[in-house]
C-alpha cells in the first residue's frame, strides 16, 4: 500500500534480509500476501494494521501491479502483487501483528516527503516506486493499474545499491 499522510508524505518501513543474503537495507511500503478468501483491498487494509498499526485509512484503488521474484529470509518468492493507494491522518501505532520473519527484518518506520524520495532515490520495494510516486502524491490515480514489473536492469541496479563494494 502506498499510503500518504495529510502532508503528502509516504510511509516507508526499513527492511533488511534476516538471512543476510541480500546486503544492506531498503525502504518498503506496507504490504504482504493475500490470505485465502481475501481480495487485494481487504489484504491491503489488514497489512496496514499488521505492519504499521494504521486502522483508519481511505483505501483507494489498485494503482500498480507487478510480478516479482526474490529471495528473502532464505525463502524464494515468485508472486503477483497488487498495490493500492491510501490516505490516512498520519497516525501509526507501530506494527500491530508482524509475522516472526517480519519482526526480525523490519526496522524504523518513517514518513518521507515525496521530494526526499525522488531526490535521494533510496533503495525501495517496489523497485520502481521512485519512477511513479510523484503522480500518486499529486492525486493523479491511473484509470487502470500500471504494470511496474521490474526489468533485469532495475533489479541489477537495486542489488548494486545495497552492496558496499
Residue spans for each PLM region:
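A generic membrane alpha-helix/interface feature
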Residues: 18, 71, 131-133
Amino acid at each position: 500500500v502506498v499510503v500518504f499522510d495529510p502532508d503528502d508524505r509516504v510511509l516507508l518501513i526499513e527492511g533488511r534480509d534476516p538471512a543476510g543474503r541480500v546486503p544492506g537495507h531498503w525502504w518498503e511500503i506496507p504490504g504482504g500476501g493475500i490470505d485465502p478468501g481475501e481480495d487485494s483491498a481487504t489484504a491491503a487494509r489488514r497489512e496496514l494494521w499488521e505492519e504499521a498499526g494504521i486502522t483508519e485509512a481511505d483505501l483507494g484503488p489498485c494503482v500498480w501491479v507487478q510480478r516479482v521474484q526474490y529471495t528473502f529470509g532464505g525463502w524464494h518468492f515468485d508472486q503477483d502483487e497488487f498495490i493500492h493507494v491510501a490516505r490516512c491522518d498520519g497516525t501509526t501505532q507501530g506494527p500491530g501483528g508482524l509475522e516472526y520473519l517480519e519482526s526480525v527484518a523490519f526496522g524504523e518506520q518513517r514518513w518521507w516527503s515525496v521530494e526526499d524520495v525522488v531526490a535521494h532515490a533510496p533503495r525501495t520495494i517496489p523497485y520502481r516506486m521512485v519512477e511513479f510516486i510523484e503522480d500518486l502524491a499529486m492525486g493523479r490515480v491511473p484509470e487502470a493499474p500500471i504494470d511496474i514489473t521490474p526489468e533485469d536492469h532495475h533489479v541489477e541496479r537495486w542489488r548494486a545499491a545495497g552492496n558496499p563494494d
